């Protein structure tokens, strides 16, 4: 089957970079930088759609469901990147936010031929995850037409699940299939068809919003502090102390003692200090308020 790439916005030539191979290095980079500046602005009109996805994901996570990203190539890698950052940043379990890439683990590091064209495999990869209507699927493809992702979307719909997409082609087949389509138009790439550039940047910005927004909604952030951060290295151990100090305006010794007493759980330590409670009392209060610090403090 032939594909008319000229119809895809992401495959058109960019007049602003037509002579980029003749420019000095600084001028070449200036063109790239100027093109990149369009990306954030292209996302702005889609904030209502992104908000809808955030709220759907938050509701799914509260109910025991999952956020599943699926894509091929750069798009798939971006989903995996966002998913992999959720456990250390927000203390989620690895299975709560999952990234799937066409071609599996090998495709993370190198290109795997033809896998993005396998529609049946997209559905099969969701089946292998026991995907259900409790989960949210976010399909990722710059072109908006990747068969692998479309297969996954169709399977998700067959399970009556909520399906969103992040693409840079508002007229692609994926946009027609999605419950919510987030399709910022970033224009042709500096290097024709190289969607790891502006399209990839746009997808990354949107994924940042989806995961971060959902985590804020389910209580993983207090003020602007990542209060469920896990202490998996020296930097994060120090960050925990800093977070408790910032949240409670206490001294270092008080923050350290509270963290030591509660098994290094920032939320518990914060409630201990602010409400003058023991570790057990703070843990119980947080549990009664679904892990939301503000709700817990208002009910002391």
UniProtKB/Swiss-Prot annotation:
GO molecular function: carbohydrate derivative binding; carbon-oxygen lyase activity; ether hydrolase activity
Protein name: N-acetylmuramic acid 6-phosphate etherase
Swiss-Prot/TrEMBL keywords: Carbohydrate metabolism, Lyase
Pathway listed: Amino-sugar metabolism; 1,6-anhydro-N-acetylmuramate degradation; Amino-sugar metabolism; N-acetylmuramate degradation; Cell wall biogenesis; peptidoglycan recycling
CDD domains: SIS_Etherase
InterPro entries: Etherase_MurQ, Glucokinase_regulatory_CS, MURQ/GCKR, Reg_chr_condens, SIS_dom, SIS_dom_sf
Organism: Klebsiella aerogenes (Enterobacter aerogenes)
Active site per UniProt: 85, 116
Top-level taxonomic group: Bacteria
């Amino acid at each position: 089957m032939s594909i008319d790439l000229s119809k895809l916005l992401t495959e058109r030539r960019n007049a602003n970079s037509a002579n980029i191979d003749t420019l000095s290095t600084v001028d070449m980079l200036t063109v790239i930088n100027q093109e990149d500046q369009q990306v954030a602005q292209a996302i702005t009109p889609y904030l209502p759609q992104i908000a809808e996805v955030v709220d759907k994901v938050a509701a799914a996570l509260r109910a025991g469901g999952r956020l599943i990203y699926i894509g091929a190539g750069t798009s798939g890698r971006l989903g995996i990147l966002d998913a992999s950052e959720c456990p250390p940043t927000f203390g989620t379990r690895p299975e709560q936010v999952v990234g799937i890439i066409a071609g599996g683990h090998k495709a993370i590091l190198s290109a795997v031929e033809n896998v993005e064209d396998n529609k049946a495999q997209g559905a099969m990869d969701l089946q292998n995850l026991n995907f259900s209507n409790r989960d949210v699927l976010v399909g990722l493809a710059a072109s908006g037409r990747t068969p692998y992702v479309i297969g996954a979307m169709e399977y998700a719909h067959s399970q009556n699940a909520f399906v969103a997409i992040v693409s840079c082609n508002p007229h692609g087949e994926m946009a027609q299939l999605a419950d919510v389509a987030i399709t910022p138009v970033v224009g042709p790439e500096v290097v024709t068809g190289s969607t790891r550039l502006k399209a990839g940047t746009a997808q990354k910005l949107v994924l940042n919003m989806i995961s971060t927004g959902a985590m804020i909604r389910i209580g993983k952030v207090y003020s602007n502090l990542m209060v469920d951060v896990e202490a998996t290295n020296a930097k994060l151990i120090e960050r925990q102390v800093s977070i408790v100090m910032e949240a409670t305006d206490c001294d270092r010794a008080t923050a350290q003692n509270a963290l030591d007493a509660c098994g290094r759980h920032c939320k518990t330590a914060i409630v201990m200090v602010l409400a003058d409670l023991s570790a057990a009392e703070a843990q119980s209060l947080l549990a009664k308020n679904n892990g939301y610090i503000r709700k817990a403090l208002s009910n002391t």
